């Protein structure tokens, strides 16, 4: 499994090196200052508030800060996870790129815990999301990491 993650890491680094920008800006930082995205403070505050409500048991899961109070299993995803786990002695490691604060993990974990013996859900996100997740949401199954090399070692 570690070899597969290292191979994926290599491919992602290559794609990252090929990323460029166009426009009337001299630098990436100059362009970034003129736009707002998912890393804005307002969005971060909203999604962290929702994530903490899930952690505190006030909601079952959230999706982009929208709270859900009833179970909504993602059956196609669960079926694939179970199929993969069946090949690996009911053990499953998931690398969730852009997984926010584990919304898909929280949505499906109760179902998966009944059928998968050992699960590790690794979320790779923006650095400030990872830091918040490590400090407030991580547990033995749910891991937050920014560095692909550390992910490959997990």
Predicted regions and their residues:
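Class I SAM-dependent methyltransferase Rossmann-like catalytic core
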Residues: 34-90
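Class I SAM-dependent methyltransferase SAM/SAH-binding core
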Residues: 96-151
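Generic alpha-helical secondary structure signal
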Residues: 3, 75, 127-131
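Charged/polar, solvent-exposed surface patches and flexible loops
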Residues: 7, 30, 49, 79, ...
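Membrane-proximal basic amphipathic "stem/tether" segments
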Residues: 1-37
């Amino acid at each position: 499994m570690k070899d597969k993650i290292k191979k994926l890491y290599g491919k992602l680094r290559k794609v990252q090196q090929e990323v460029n920008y166009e426009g009337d800006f001299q630098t990436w930082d100059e362009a970034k200052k003129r736009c707002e995205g998912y890393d804005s403070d307002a969005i971060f505050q909203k999604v962290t508030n929702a994530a903490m409500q899930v952690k505190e048991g006030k909601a079952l899961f959230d999706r982009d800060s929208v709270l859900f109070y009833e179970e909504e299993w993602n059956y196609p995803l669960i079926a694939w996870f179970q199929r993969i786990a069946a090949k690996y002695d009911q053990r499953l490691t998931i690398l969730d790129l852009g997984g926010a604060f584990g919304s898909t993990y929280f949505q499906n974990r109760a179902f998966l815990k009944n059928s998968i013996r050992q699960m590790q859900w690794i979320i790779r996100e923006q650095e400030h999301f990872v830091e918040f997740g490590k400090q407030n949401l991580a547990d033995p199954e749910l891991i937050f990491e920014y560095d692909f090399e550390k992910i490959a070692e997990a």
